[in-house]
């Protein structure tokens, strides 16, 4: 776990996801599952403006609080606009975003070093149900990506069902989206995306897949 320059405490894996998106000043980013706000505030720190959505009002208030605290230490940061919304039905215009981040709800099996109880709480059926939700969110989020924009899917788990299989289903149903080459070391290739392994990066386990929407 690291403490960023703006004082926000965040696992290294989440920082690496935000960095891999390459957000620039003035970009419009939609983070559809934003709570507690670590990735959203990191992207705003790069100068991007971020719509930070989450399903539950309490979770969105958490994002808003973290955005206020981090912005106080970063006068040049982009705006963070909290939004209560179901990621499967976000009330946003199609093609609105330069970058859409789907940091989807998942089994959390990549964070066993911090939450070992998940080893006994999460069942195979849970993983299967989560993968259906993940695919639905990813499909809906693709509609928000502007031509030439980036769609990113990340989960703090290492199960094949929630990573490679979700990515393969998306690629099969969205042939116009082109897989982007995965980031380099310490990421390791995993299907069309990449993994961070706890033992290799001293971080949570994380998977990342990214696609580019064609210009036309």
Give the ranges of each region predicted by the language model:
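S-adenosylmethionine
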Residues: 1-216
């Amino acid at each position: 776990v690291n403490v960023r320059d703006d004082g926000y405490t965040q696992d290294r894996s989440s920082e690496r996801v935000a960095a891999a998106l390459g957000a620039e000043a003035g970009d419009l980013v939609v983070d559809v599952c934003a709570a507690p706000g670590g990735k959203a505030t990191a992207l705003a720190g790069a100068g991007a403006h971020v719509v930070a959505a989450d399903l539950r009002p309490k979770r969105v208030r958490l994002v808003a609080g973290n955005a206020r605290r981090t912005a106080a230490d970063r006068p040049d940061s982009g705006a963070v606009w909290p939004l209560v919304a179901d990621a499967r039905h976000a009330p946003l215009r199609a093609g609105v975003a330069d970058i859409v981040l789907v940091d989807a709800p998942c089994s959390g099996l990549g964070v066993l070093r911090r939450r070992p109880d998940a080893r006994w709480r999460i069942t195979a059926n849970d993983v299967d149900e989560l993968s259906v939700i993940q695919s639905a969110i990813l499909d809906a989020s693709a509609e928000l990506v502007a031509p030439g924009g980036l769609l990113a899917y990340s989960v703090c788990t290492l199960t094949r069902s929630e990573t490679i299989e979700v990515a393969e289903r998306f690629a099969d149903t969205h042939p116009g989206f082109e897989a982007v080459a995965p980031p380099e070391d310490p990421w390791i290739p995993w299907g069309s995306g990449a993994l961070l392994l706890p033992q290799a990066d001293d971080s949570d386990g994380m998977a990342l897949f990214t696609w580019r929407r064609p210009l036309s």
